[in-house]
A protein has these predicted regions:
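Adenylate-forming AMP-binding core of the ANL superfamily, especially NRPS adenylation
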Residues: 30-77, 85
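AMP-binding/adenylate-forming catalytic core of the ANL superfamily
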Residues: 12, 68, 73-74, 81-84, ...
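Gly/Ser/Thr-rich phosphate-binding loop
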Residues: 1-31, 44
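Short, glycine/acidic-enriched loop or turn micro-motifs at the edges of active sites
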Residues: 15, 52, 99
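Acidic/polar alpha-helix N-cap and adjacent early helical turns
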Residues: 210-224
Length: 224
């Protein structure tokens, strides 16, 4: 307000400068806050099934892909890396998961590489994180896969509590019970003071797996 400016949300990658989607200043407040808006004019954005490559119907989660003037031609002198993200139809695969709604707005829901595969079930950490944020006393939460001898991976929740709050693992599981699918309820629950971060302040989600193994060892928790 001090700068007499209105804020919109823009989603994209360095490889899709200046972006892939954006909301408009005249969009409703909930659209500007809860989505990343429409695709840019003269570009194509689609949500595809990572396993089949087919375009997902409205409301179904898949990988965000982009084609158009805003898509890079390739990585400098690195054709192998280019081939990993640009397909034969010149669509760039972002690695991000998203959903397109009935109004054509997109919502980012997570990262493919963060997906937890538990006994053949695909579990998206962000879904569980958003659910656990509703638990009173939770300040911040991250969910990651912890290696499992039986299932390949199990769900691990790393929780930062609000100041002065005391909570037990049983409190978290009781909150989840009968509200989310049983296989999505965290097997391992860790109360931590901070998350591993980059120098720029981004959470290093890939390090949570190692942190979980370390905490299990320190606390005498058997990995099943």
């Amino acid at each position: 307000e001090k700068m007499y400016m209105k804020v919109t949300s823009v989603y994209g990658l360095t490889e899709t400068a200046p972006g892939m989607t954006a909301s408009r200043i005249d969009d409703p407040f909930d659209v500007r806050c809860n989505t990343v808006g429409h695709d840019f004019e003269f570009t194509e954005v689609k949500v595809i099934d990572p396993e089949t490559g087919e375009e997902c119907p409205v409301g179904v989660q898949g990988e965000m892909c982009n084609r158009g003037y805003n898509t890079m031609k390739g990585y400098y002198k690195n054709p192998e890396a280019t081939a990993e993200v640009l397909d034969e139809n010149n669509f760039l695969h972002s690695g991000d998961l998203g959903i397109k709604d009935e109004d054509g707005n997109y919502r980012i829901t997570g990262r493919i590489k963060d997906m937890i595969i538990r006994g053949g079930e695909n579990i998206y950490p962000r879904e569980i994180e958003e659910f656990l944020y509703k638990l009173d006393g939770v300040k911040d939460v991250q969910v990651a896969g912890i290696p499992s001898k039986k299932y390949g991976e199990a769900v691990g929740a790393f929780i930062i509590l609000q100041e002065g709050v005391q909570m037990q693992e049983a409190d978290v599981r009781d909150f989840c019970r009968n509200k989310i699918s049983r296989y999505k309820i965290p097997k391992y629950i860790f109360f931590v003071n901070e998350f591993p971060m980059t120098g720029s302040g981004k959470i290093q989600k890939f390090r949570l797996k190692d942190l979980g193994l370390q905490l299990c060892k320190e606390q005498g928790i058997e990995i099943i």
